[in-house]
């Protein structure tokens, strides 16, 4: 049996129905009545979640409408997030092709330092070998010159002894400035 009260239909069961069935029936009937009341009432049309936020209460609003508005807004947000993600991926892909210079600065400095160290080491060893070679050449030249000097000294001694005293007097007769140069 159905009884009408202010805005709802109440089912009264004289038969032995389960309480769950009775509540479900009552709930379904109440929802149908609310839908009819919303569609017949001259209220503002609700087109977005902002319109729902401006309402005082959600009593007269269809739950399907609320669900659809929430789903629509969620879909918009998801699409916006996906577009942002795609833009980010495209920017990363473009920047991935460009190799940043920062990536090569440290290895470049390491290469320069190691290269200059190797260069200085090799240059020092080359300079040392060249110096030793030049030193040995100069020693040979000194030995040759010493040998020539010794020979000249010996020749001069033999030559001086052969001249005797006459050559000494002639050297004294030369002017003083000639004795210094010859």
From Swiss-Prot:
Transit peptide, from-to = 1-45
Q: Among its keywords, does the record have Chaperone?
A: yes
> Which residue ranges does UniProt annotate as crossing the membrane?
108-127
One GO CC annotation: INA complex
UniProt keyword terms in alphabetical order: Chaperone, Coiled coil, Membrane, Mitochondrion, Mitochondrion inner membrane, Transit peptide, Transmembrane, Transmembrane helix
- Which residue ranges are assigned to the Mitochondrial intermembrane compartment in the record's topology? 128-182
Where is the protein found, in the record's own terms? Mitochondrion inner membrane
**Complexes and interactors:** Component of the inner membrane assembly (INA) complex, composed of INA17 and INA22. Interacts with a subset of F(1)F(0)-ATP synthase subunits of the F(1)-domain and the peripheral stalk.
Please state what the protein is called. Answer: Inner membrane assembly complex subunit 17
From which lineage does this chain's organism come? Eukaryota, Fungi, Dikarya, Ascomycota, Saccharomycotina
Q: Its encoding gene is what?
A: INA17
